[in-house]
Amino acid sequence: MLAFNFKKFLQSGQYSDVEFSIKPEMFPISKMFKAHRQLLALRNEVFAAMFYGPLPEKDVVVITDLHPDGFYGLLKYLYTGKPKIKSTEEAMYTRTAADKYLEPYLALTCSEYISAHVTAEQVCHVIDYTLLTGGEYVDNAVGRLLEDRPEAILASDAFTDCLQETVHFVLEKVTNVPEMYVVLAVHRWAQAFCQKIATTGNKPVDIKTAIAPFLAKLRFLALTPEEFVTFNTSDDTRDVLCKDDAFAIMSVILCNKSIELPSWACKERKPRCSDTKMSGC
C-alpha cells in the first residue's frame, strides 16, 4: 500500500512526463492520459521494463488493445494502491488491463466485483466482451444467471444486440426456460441482425439466413404441437423453416416415430427446464 495518495497528480497531470494514447481497435473511443514514469515504474514491473529497459518507450505510448476506462482503472490502482470499481463494465475493462500489466490482485478484485454485481440484463455484454478479448473463461456468475434468470437474459436488449458467438454460448448454457421462449428470443435476435445489416449498406440478409446458424441448437422437438404450429403459421416466423422440414419435425412431435428429421435438426426432446446440459444435438 502507498503511504500517500497520488491520485490528484493523475487527475491534474501535474509534473507528468509521459502520455498514454488509448486507441482501442475494437471500440469507437479514444483517450489520452498524462502520467509519471517513475511512479509507474516503482509500482509495476511491466512499466519499469517499458520505461527503463533496453528499449525505453518515448514520450507518447500508444495502446490499441485496452478500453480507456480499463487503462484508467489500472492507473487509479497504481496511483492510490486501492482498487476502486464502480460498474460491471469498468470491472471488465480494468481486469483486462490488470491481466496485461500483471496485477493479479486488481484482476481478482474485478472478478469479485463482476460476480457480485452483474445483472441478467448485462450478461450478454459480459459474454460479448470476453469473447472479443479472447478470454479463456466466462465468469461463474454468468453461468448462474443463465440458470436462475434465463428469461430476463433472453428478453434483454443486450441479447438482441449481442454477437453471433454469444448467441451460441447462451444456447449451449441456458436452462430452466421453456423452449418456445428460447426460439422466439433467437428469432428476435435474427430480426435485429437483419436490420443492422440493412443500415450498413451491405448486401441485405433475410431472416431465414440470419437464424440458420442456430437452428441445430433449438429444441423444436421439445415444443408442444400447438407451439410448433403457432411458430410455423404466425406472420413473423412462418418463413423460418421450409415446408418439408416443418412437416418432418411436426410428424415426430405428433407421432413420436422414427421419421427422418432434417440433417440439421436437434434430436433432443427434453425441455431445458428438466436438465442442465444439452445432449443429442
Q: Which sequence ranges carry the predicted segments?
A:
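Eukaryotic helix-linker segments that join adjacent hydrophobic helices
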Residues: 63-76
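Cytochrome P450 catalytic domain signature, combining two hallmark sequence patches
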Residues: 45-60
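Eukaryotic cytosolic interaction/assembly regions at protein N-termini and domain boundaries
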Residues: 14-16, 148-281
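N-terminal BTB/POZ boundary and linker segment
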Residues: 1-37, 41, 76-88
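Short, charge-rich binding segments
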Residues: 53, 63-66, 84-86
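Ordered, helix-dominated protein-protein interaction surfaces in large eukaryotic regulatory proteins
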Residues: 22, 37, 41-42, 49, ...
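Eukaryote-biased feature marking scaffold/signaling PDZ-domain proteins and nuclear chromatin regulators
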Residues: 10-15, 28-30, 34-35, 42, ...
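Post-BTB helical module
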Residues: 73, 79-168, 172, 199
